[in-house]
Amino acid sequence: MSTKMTPPVEKNEFIDVVFEDLTHDGAGVAKVKGYPIFVKNGLPGEEAQIKIIKVKKNFAFGRLMKLHTESPYRKDAECPVYNQCGGCQLQHLTYEGQLQAKEKQVRDVMQRIGGLSDVPVHPVLGMKNPWVYRNKAQVPIGEREGGLVAGFYRQGTHDIINMESCLIQAEENDTLIQEVKRICEKHGISAYNEERNKGTLRHVMARYGQVTGEIMLVFITRTAELPNKKAIIEEIATKFPEVKSIVQNVNPKRTNVIFGDKTTVLYGSEYIYDFIGDIKFAISARSFYQVNPEQTKVLYDKTLEYAKLDGNETVIDAYCGIGSISLFLAQKAKKVYGVEIVPEAIEDAKRNAALNNMTNAEFGVGEAEVVIPKWYKEGVIADTMVVDPPRKGCDEALLNTIIDMKPKRVVYVSCNPATLARDLKVLEEGGYKTQEVQPVDMFPHTTHVECVVLMSRVEK
């Protein structure tokens, strides 16, 4: 008969612990008799007094009360609202410490999930200046004391904290959004109230082209009616000549989803333009576009290096999105085929190929695991397969398709080390060897880490 394990700690108990590790969301991990306790702001190696605030069967949560010893990597967060906002998780850790923690995270999952203990994991490629890197700001609008507030939701709530600037956001976007808030307030625009489903302005979004300097402004409203629209647009366009596009998106639904279905251009163009390396991209209000183009170039350069192209290869890019990796590869490949399930993304991909006069990139809509076997039957043989899946990783059917097609190389671009390690294990069992793993820091001060991996087919 099994005996039920009783947790070794109780709620409201004060205990001394040593933090051993960080979780994937940046909390410190301490253990009591092997039982894990997660504590926000704890860092590995630190000795601390904590208070137990929630006890579950297999783990508990604690609050950091007092540090007995401090990590040499601990620092004061530079953002005044760091502890209220959920946007960053690692500002209390030096940037060097962040990069080391991310490298360890990748190594750990390679061993624990992938069983790949001997694979070279390189040091994380970080940023020279890990601030003001985000090119897209999406802020909720609210009302307080008769005025508009714009900022972010307090962690775990829908309470908007007013914020003049964000340290990881492009300053151009911050400046624009604060001025737009003042202009809208002056012209009597009401904020959306989600409890009453009243009011006009739900969110404001700004997109900034880091290379071109062009900005797009998006008003997301509950109703198609935007009072004093003409005067608002004139004032914004006069004050901000770099704003090349002002767009309205209407979302009448009671939902947490930000965008509605209807988008209208109010001023200028439907697109702004930006470059990653030598490739030019047209970016619409709804386009997926990497939020840190500087590090995206680092990631794509490494992808291109791993693909080892000399101009004679056929490459398939699964989960190709707006064609950003496909077009990078098309600079060196004979032919690139990109596949993506979102039709609008494929329209963007075709537009971007035309924009760059690239005739050797072809795009198809559908599930990669359906479209790629169809191409295979039509005689498309990939020398190199590139995959860049969402966080859930590759569909099992796609992994089986890769194993059946036997491309010489697989380059796997990942935003989730855990699903990456799981998928590498499947490909290893199917005849591939993982040669090297290169983590890239796309989102400094957060726990996210991207990786690009080179796999080669082992001929038996």
UniProtKB/Swiss-Prot annotation:
Range of residues in the leader sequence: none
Broad enzyme group: transferase
Pfam family membership, one: TRM5-TYW2_MTfase
Binding locations of S-adenosyl-L-methionine: 290, 319, 340, 388
Enzyme Commission no: 2.1.1.-
Assigned keywords, A-Z: 4Fe-4S, Iron, Iron-sulfur, Metal-binding, Methyltransferase, S-adenosyl-L-methionine, Transferase
Residues annotated as catalytic: 415
Annotated [4Fe-4S] cluster binding sites: 79, 85, 88, 166
The protein's name in its UniProt record: Uncharacterized RNA methyltransferase BCE_0363
Species the sequence originates in: Bacillus cereus (strain ATCC 10987 / NRS 248)
Biological classification of the source: Bacteria, Bacillati, Bacillota, Bacilli, Bacillales
